[in-house]
Regions:
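C-terminal accessory module of base-excision DNA glycosylases/AP lyases that mediates lesion recognition
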Residues: 1-29, 114, 119-120, 133-142, ...
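Residue-level marker of regulatory loop/turn positions in helix-turn-helix DNA-binding domains and
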Residues: 36, 40, 114-117, 128, ...
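Histidine/lysine/aspartate-rich catalytic loop segments that bind and position anionic ligands
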Residues: 105, 128, 144-148
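A general alpha-helix detector
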Residues: 41-46, 62, 78-82, 120-124, ...
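Short alpha-helical scaffolding segments that buttress acidic/His motifs in well-ordered protein cores
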Residues: 42-47, 96-100, 139, 190-194
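A positional/architectural concept
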Residues: 8, 15-61, 65-68
């Protein structure tokens, strides 16, 4: 599902950033696809931690083929060795178990999560071992539908800025703040197109 803000964001960024305008024109019909399954979205974020988009895509395909109905109770029944065959590290497997337990123990919160303030969502999710700021950013971006995520802790995001805006890594915080101000309130759109400029397949979680 395309975010409601997407087309407005494209127009806004095209008018305010010549670099992004060229990328947007290169991929005119593509867009960020929201994942309404909050559980799957968080699992996808864990799988995608610190690996390439193509590697994450391969692991996700194997993982979601393990069971026709990937839900917390089913995942907790999966043997660790079976999950390792999908390409998951032991650490990520433990994180997946942690998320599964969280969803089983917090059904009321999950059922109403899109009604909560994002500060509350962050405070709740950060307590899950394995879920950090990057994972929460991906969740807010790809599930909750926040239009203004600026994930400065994402390596691909920083790599794209370095490449497209001719800045050496580490990029100065002052410059990142200028970009954030320029792109606001549509940093999520900018982020997605920066990723798209690097990867042969669109990023999804």
């Amino acid at each position: 599902m395309k975010p409601k803000y997407w087309n407005k964001g494209k127009s806004y960024l095209s008018n305010n950033d010549t670099v992004l305008k060229l990328i947007i024109e290169k991929f005119p019909d593509e867009y960020l696809k929201l994942n309404a399954n909050f559980y799957h979205a968080l699992l996808n974020s864990i799988i995608g931690q610190q690996i390439s988009v193509s590697a994450a895509s391969s692991i996700k395909k194997k993982f979601f083929n393990l069971n026709k109905n990937i839900k917390p109770s089913n995942v907790l029944k999966l043997n660790e060795n079976i999950l390792k065959l999908c390409g998951l590290s032991r650490q990520k497997i433990l994180y997946i178990y942690n998320i599964s337990n969280f969803f089983l123990e917090n059904k009321k919160f999950i059922a109403n999560i899109d009604l909560y303030d994002e500060v509350i969502i962050k405070e709740k999710l950060i307590n899950i071992k394995g879920v950090g700021n990057w994972t929460i950013d991906m969740f807010l971006l790809f599930s909750i539908g926040n239009s203004n995520i600026f994930p400065c802790g994402d390596l691909g995001f920083i790599k794209a800025i370095s490449k497209l805006y001719k800045k050496e890594i580490p990029i100065k915080e002052a410059y990142l703040n200028r970009l954030k101000k320029r792109w606001s309130p549509y940093s999520s759109v900018a982020t997605w197109y920066l990723w798209r400029s690097l990867d042969p397949i669109p990023v999804s979680y």
